[in-house]
Amino acid sequence: MELTLHEARVIGCLLEKEVTTPEQYPLSLNALTLACNQKTSRDPVLDLSEALVQDALDSLNKKRLISEQSGFGSRVVKYKHRFCNTEFSELQLSSAAVAIICLLLLRGPQTPGELRTRSNRLHDFKDVLEVEACIKQLMERDKPVLAQLPREPGKRECRYAELFSQGAEQINAASLSADSPSAGSNSLNAQDRQQLEARVTQLEEQVAELKDKLDSLIASLS
């Protein structure tokens, strides 16, 4: 399953609204366009026309990832996803897994901590460990749907990406780039961490000492 940026946004919005506003689901083209273009909880922020959203829907329909619904005399066609948890879907996911995949589709790669903070309307994770456990399950499927990205410089947590729109080739390229010598020496940083921490401590002590002397000088002049 390979999704374009626009297709991923449409699927992410349908997954989100199914949980957060079930009374308004399925979504009309207008409602779906508004959801795709939200200024909050979206990365990147898009400005899609209804025509572009319709193009994405037509493509998803050919892939059998959405279905159209109209009824009760209304001429307005509404759309629902067939991305997961349908009778014939290959993807049968827990609500926790749906929440994680939904957030990654809507906001791109994120850390477990970010996923837990942002998932409160989709699923109630009790802690980050539960998020990490769910991520692990999604990565260990016969067909993995998530991948771990190389840790960014200065960050403590790794980010994770979905593999529906973030292709495996892109993930592997990012990993190779991060592991190359020109990308920065993460291993060297790890080896020198103690020395750097000791140096920082020493500098902090020197700054504190200078501050004490400055305070004493100011006091003597006043």
From Swiss-Prot:
Residues 175-194 are annotated as: Disordered. It comes from the Bacteria. Residues 175-193 have a biased composition (Polar residues). HAMAP family: UPF0502. Belongs to the UPF0502 family. This is UPF0502 protein Shewmr4_1554. It comes from Shewanella sp. (strain MR-4).
